[in-house]
Amino acid sequence: MSDTSKTNLSEQLFAPRMNTKETSNLVKIANLKSASVHNALDGDSESGWYRVLRRPQWIWQGIDPIEMEAILSRMASSTATRTSDELLDTVIGYKPGNWIYEWTQVGAKLQKKARAYVEAGQKEKAADTLLKASMYYSVAAYPHLKGDTLAAQAEIQANQSYRESMALTPHQIRTIDVKYEGKTFQAFIHLPRTDKLLPTVIVSGGLDSLQSDLWRLYRDYFGPAGFAMVTLDMPSVGHSSRWALTEDTSRLHQALVQQIRDVPWVDNTKVAMLGLRFGANAAIRLGFMEPTRLKTCISLGGAIHSMLTQPTMLDSMPRMYLDVIASRMGKHGVSKSSLTSHLPAWSLKNQGLLGRRKVDVPMLGISLKNDPVCREIDNQLIEKSSRGGKAITLPDTPLHDGYHRSMVTVIEWLKDKLA
């Protein structure tokens, strides 16, 4: 794509529009009070912010911490009209002080910098810079609520930057077009080498992230361990946005695992799945749906049963997370009680999968102590419902490296099961 066309795309996407709804005003669950969260997987909810600020994860993904604080500071000091005067990140319209505006401005600067690197023949620097641009655009779109017009435009830029980086990176990255229900969604496969068949890990994140956010998992963990990594978005998110989230959380993953046999480089006898948060619900479910195609399934802080069946646990969730769940389910303007009445159907225990029979796929349930989403009993359900299963609860301190400690444990498990 030429520089001019890229510029035109950005200008076209973010051209001023009337009546663009601000993110926090999209779902509007009735009579809802927000709670706080503070943990390694989700980040921190802070007074005065609608969004949960995922500082440690964003830094880990490649966001510059000084730049991040400057962005947040510009939002905080803005005098523009807000949806809620008490919430700093609710400036209305694509203008200075607006969450999406501030993050996309930095993403655009990085895109321009990357083009300069390309012209100078510095492809590796250009690839790294484009990956960073993709992360800034993804944070701009966070938490990826359906119907958020500006966020959808930021997602387009995130995907564009990620695709451009793929063409330049020394790593081997390809797209996989997966057909399902007469439509197609895209997954990405990341390859440490292409001269042999590789053990492969399918990965899905939560409901508030894009598959491009998972790049660091490949670079720091799967790639060095010799695993190929295949990512896909959860239903209703990113490349999978044309499918609503239903209690059949694993249906897109099932379509992928059924078609992955046709993908070069993948050792079909050594395929695993890892899911984070709601992605873990899909991962464990897939183990029951496709036990002959998977060697192991892993839940990292998964929304498996407890959170979905105990309304009191949702009382400890920030409003943003409840908005995300409601958005994925297509529930707008409903009461909290109406929302929670639908969630038990997502419980893998209520679906008759966990706690009733053992599947031959060894499964790992892992979380940090005091996890607000995944209780120890959830991991124990996973352990008891699979032959060779295991439940692990890691210390929740130090907070900043909880993600790393979890992934080290995951890699050790995969090396054993995919040997």
Swiss-Prot record:
**Hydrolase as a keyword?**
yes
Task: Please state what the protein is called.
Answer: Esterase FrsA
Taxonomic lineage of this organism? Bacteria, Pseudomonadati, Pseudomonadota, Gammaproteobacteria, Vibrionales
Q: Which organism is it from?
A: Photobacterium profundum (strain SS9)
Q: Which gene encodes it?
A: frsA
Q: Which keywords does UniProt give here?
A: Hydrolase, Serine esterase
Q: Which reaction does it catalyse?
A: a carboxylic ester + H2O = an alcohol + a carboxylate + H(+)
Q: What does this protein do?
A: Catalyzes the hydrolysis of esters.
- Source domain of life is Bacteria
Q: Which family does it belong to?
A: Belongs to the FrsA family.
